[in-house]
Amino acid sequence: MAKQKKHPTGTIAQNKKARHDYFIEHKFEAGLVLSGWEVKSLRAGKAHLTDSYVLLKDGEAWLFGSHITPLTTASTHVIADPIRTRKLLLNKRELERLEAAVAQKGYTCVALALYWSKHLIKCEIALGKGKKEFDKRDTMRERDSNRELQRAVRNKGKED
């Protein structure tokens, strides 16, 4: 009997820029329609979500701007397009909720992460509202003050 392969666990790729540029209000888990070479590349961790976003059209969700680099050992008879649009698999209720929210001014749908869920690759997408420049500065100030507070609490325990 063949030995079972263990699938890699955890996150494949993250979009840290999206968390910086948007107030994340609601998250969804979506499946992806992938071809064989894309799954091989994702197993190797060769994916980027930096400028990716989700577009809703004709009652379907599509992932744009995600970059999956093809492996050199991948199949040669398939032309690999690293930046092709990929269909996202969501429930009808989730799609309707996303479409209603995106129709409101200021809301957008972005991809946050690609990760393994058992033997499947999932995409975490989020409904977000764009941050203004002063919002980004406020977030940075708040993060710095929390870091200083944690540092002070840690150092207070060492002095005693």
From Swiss-Prot:
One of its GO terms (cellular component) is cytosol. PROSITE patterns: SSRP. It is found in: Cytoplasm. Residues 136-160 are annotated as: Disordered. The keyword RNA-binding applies. InterPro entries: SmpB (IPR023620), SsrA-bd_prot (IPR000037), SsrA-bd_prot_CS (IPR020081). It holds the Pfam family SmpB. Transmembrane segments: none annotated. NCBIfam families: PRK05422.1, smpB. Belongs to the SmpB family. PANTHER family: SSRA-BINDING PROTEIN, TMRNA-BINDING COMPONENT OF TRANS-TRANSLATION TAGGING COMPLEX. This is SsrA-binding protein. It comes from Pseudomonas putida (strain GB-1).
